[in-house]
Amino acid sequence: MNTPLTDLLGCRYPIIQTAMGWVADANLVAATSNAGGFGFLAGAVMTLEEIEQGIAAIKAKTDAPFGVNFHMYVPFAEDIVDLCVAQRVKAVS
């Protein structure tokens, strides 16, 4: 299915799995992305190290694109952005 959203995010279906705190972990994100949706890791409830581990776990389970959600007001927000860029995460919110 081609829509502006699927073209932008590189997913098969225009379905976004939101970054629900304490629920949207690497397993859910990878499963969503593998099913053709676009999964978001709930980084807003994680430390930088947990986000890094989550990204690695997602990449071990899927080659499909995914995103990371986080709060811009955390002291390490710039580090999260740098991590997402370095890991080629498709989207952040």
What does each model-found stretch correspond to?
Residues M1-S93:
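Active-site entrance/lid segments in N-terminal catalytic domains of soluble metabolic enzymes
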